[in-house]
Amino acid sequence: MTHSPDLKGSSFTLSVLHLSDNEIANTVEFLQEKVSQAPSFFASAPLVINIAKVQGDIDFPALKQGIADAGFIPVGITGSKDKRVQNLASEAGFAIMSASKSPSQAPAKMAPTKVVRTPVRSGQQIYAKDGDLVVLAHVSAGAEVIADGSIHIHGTLRGRAIAGASGQQEARIICHDLQAELVSIAGDYWLSDQIESEYWQKKVMISKAEESLHLEVLAI
């Protein structure tokens, strides 16, 4: 029996780079710095470019090459309804994308919570598909914990925590001691140098609202 290809719709969480100007060199330098800070997270990651705030023309071929040279995979642009701009981007090999009008929701049927009782060592990756993740120990630097739902860490988070991996905007990250290399919820992320000192080494809850991460120190 011959099986033919099947084309179906789906959704993915992609990193979005919001440009404020058309200075390609500055953009490439910024991306290179991000890759050097968290290479296992950013290297060969697909990237969408939001150009809504850019005034003036963009050298799209140079932008695409710069993104690739920095270690990302340029996917498409969003944020412009100007047909001339869209045509220039398309000619350079960018897809023309539009943001979804409704946020991704949790799966209709969540999987049971995945519980990890041992420390997550450097180089390990734990993934809770379609559900929440609970780690009853520490997450070491160089380790990665991922969940389509929320993540609870009953120890120190020194590695990377990625919640809402399938786009769930309501996901949370809760940890007893925040020293993370990276935290991410539904595609929005902060690196360690973006986390303010008032939250460092504290018990915190991280949530997402209005396309930005929010941190709250927990008293309990």
Swiss-Prot record:
SUPFAM superfamilies: Cell-division inhibitor MinC, C-terminal domain (SSF63848). It comes from the Bacteria. The keyword Cell division applies. GO terms for biological process: cell morphogenesis; division septum assembly; regulation of cell division; regulation of cell septum assembly. Gene3D superfamilies: 2.160.20.70, 3.30.70.260. Keywords: Cell cycle, Cell division, Septation. InterPro entries: CAP/MinC_C, MinC, MinC_C_sf, MinC_N, Septum_form_inhib_MinC_C. Belongs to the MinC family. Interacts with MinD and FtsZ. NCBIfam families: minC. Cell division inhibitor that blocks the formation of polar Z ring septums. Rapidly oscillates between the poles of the cell to destabilize FtsZ filaments that have formed before they mature into polar Z rings. Prevents FtsZ polymerization. This is Probable septum site-determining protein MinC. It comes from Vibrio parahaemolyticus serotype O3:K6 (strain RIMD 2210633). The gene is minC.
